[in-house]
UniProtKB/Swiss-Prot annotation:
Molecular functions per Gene Ontology: 8-oxo-7,8-dihydroguanine DNA N-glycosylase activity; class I DNA-(apurinic or apyrimidinic site) endonuclease activity; damaged DNA binding; zinc ion binding
Protein name stated in the entry: Formamidopyrimidine-DNA glycosylase
Domain of life: Bacteria
One Pfam family, short name: Fapy_DNA_glyco
Residues involved in DNA binding: 91, 110
PROSITE patterns: FPG_CAT, ZF_FPG_1, ZF_FPG_2
Free-text cofactor note: Binds 1 zinc ion per subunit.
Reactions catalysed: Hydrolysis of DNA containing ring-opened 7-methylguanine residues, releasing 2,6-diamino-4-hydroxy-5-(N-methyl)formamidopyrimidine; 2'-deoxyribonucleotide-(2'-deoxyribose 5'-phosphate)-2'-deoxyribonucleotide-DNA = a 3'-end 2'-deoxyribonucleotide-(2,3-dehydro-2,3-deoxyribose 5'-phosphate)-DNA + a 5'-end 5'-phospho-2'-deoxyribonucleoside-DNA + H(+)
Source organism phylogeny: Bacteria, Bacillati, Bacillota, Bacilli, Lactobacillales
Start and end residues, zinc fingers (FPG-type): 238-272
Length: 275
C-alpha cells in the first residue's frame, strides 16, 4: 500500500504532469470507486482546471478551484499519463481526458481506490469525520498531544500508529521502521510506553517519513511514481522485508510475526516484549 512518502512522490509527479490542464471528459469504468454522487462526478469534472495537487496523509487532493477531487490509492492505485493513445489494460478504471490531448489514467489492480468530489470548504470536515491525525512535521505533530493520546489508550502501539488518528501517513512498512528505530515492541500497550519511548517514536516518525520522501518512496510489489520511476527507500529499510537478516544495530536475526493481523518485522533483542 502506498504510504505517505509514496503518495507525496505521486503528488509531486502529478503536479509536474497536469498542473494547469483542463479536464474535458471523464470515463469511469468502476462506479463503486466514487464515494460521492456519481452524476455530479461525471457532469461536473469536465471544464474544471487542475490548479494544484496537494496531499493530506495518504490522500491526494486535486484542487479544481471551488472543488477538490480527493483520491485515495488504497492498496495498488497509481496514476499514468498518456500523451496520445491509451493502451488497452483491464486495470485502467478512470480516464481523465485533458485539453492538451493527453489522458490521465487511474490504474488499480485491486479496485480498492476511492474518489470523493467535494467543495473545498468541506475539506476540513471531511478529514475531521475520519479523525485524521496531524501531518508528521515538527510544526503540526506535537509531542505533548501525541503523549496524551498514547497514555490514555490500551491499544497495542503498532495498530494504534496504523489507525491514522495519532499521526497521518504511516502504513505497515514505515511503522515497522519507526518501531525498530525507537526500540519499541509492536505489541506494547500504548499506555505502558515511557516518556523516552514516546519521544523516540515521535522523532523517528518525523525523520523516517521525511527520509522516505527524500528517497522517492519504497518500491515494493508494484509501486511506481507518477512518472513511472521506482523509489529507492527500499534500499534504506532496516527491518521491513529483512526476515532472517542480521539487525543492523545488534546483529540478531530479524523475525517476522503477526500483530493485529499484519505481517510485522522486528529485532527480538532490540525490541523486547514486556512481560
Amino acid at each position: 500500500m502506498p504510504e505517505l512518502p509514496e503518495v507525496e512522490t505521486v503528488r509531486r509527479g502529478l503536479e509536474t504532469l497536469v498542473l494547469g490542464q483542463e479536464i474535458v471528459a471523464v470515463t469511469l469504468k468502476v462506479p463503486k470507486m466514487v464515494k460521492t454522487d456519481l452524476e455530479t462526478f461525471a457532469l461536473t469534472l469536465p471544464g474544471q482546471i487542475i490548479q494544484s495537487v496537494g496531499r493530506r496523509g495518504k490522500y491526494l487532493l486535486i484542487d479544481l478551484g471551488q472543488l477538490v477531487l480527493v483520491s485515495h490509492l488504497r492498496m495498488e492505485g497509481k496514476y499514468l499519463l498518456f500523451p496520445d493513445e491509451v493502451p488497452d489494460n483491464k486495470h485502467f478504471h478512470v480516464f481523465f481526458e485533458l485539453k492538451n490531448g493527453s489522458t490521465l489514467v487511474y490504474q488499480d489492480v485491486r479496485k480498492f481506490g476511492t474518489f470523493d468530489l467535494i467543495a473545498k470548504s468541506q475539506l476540513s470536515a471531511f478529514f475531521a469525520k475520519r479523525k485524521l491525525g496531524p501531518e508528521p512535521k515538527k510544526e503540526t505533530f506535537k509531542l505533548k498531544t501525541f503523549e496524551a493520546a498514547l497514555l490514555s489508550s490500551q491499544k497495542p502501539i503498532k495498530p494504534h500508529l496504523l489507525d491514522q488518528t495519532l499521526v497521518a501517513g504511516l502504513g505497515n512498512i514505515y511503522v515497522d521502521e519507526v518501531l525498530w528505530a525507537a526500540k519499541v515492541h509492536p505489541e506494547t500497550a500504548s499506555s505502558r510506553l515511557n516518556k523516552a519511548e514516546i519521544k523516540r517514536l515521535h522523532d523517528e516518525t518525523i525523520r523516517i517519513l521525511a527520509l522516505g520522501i527524500e528517497k522517492g518512496g519504497s518500491t515494493v510489489r508494484t509501486y511506481r511514481n507518477a512518472l513511472g520511476a521506482d523509489g529507492t527507500m527500499q534500499d534504506y529499510l532496516q527491518v521491513y522485508g529483512q526476515t532472517g537478516k542480521p539487525c543492523p544495530r545488534c546483529g540478531q536475526a530479524i523475525v517476522k510475526l503477526k500483530v493485529g493481523g499484519r505481517g510485522t518485522h522486528i529485532c527480538p533483542k532490540c525490541q523486547k516484549k514486556r512481560p
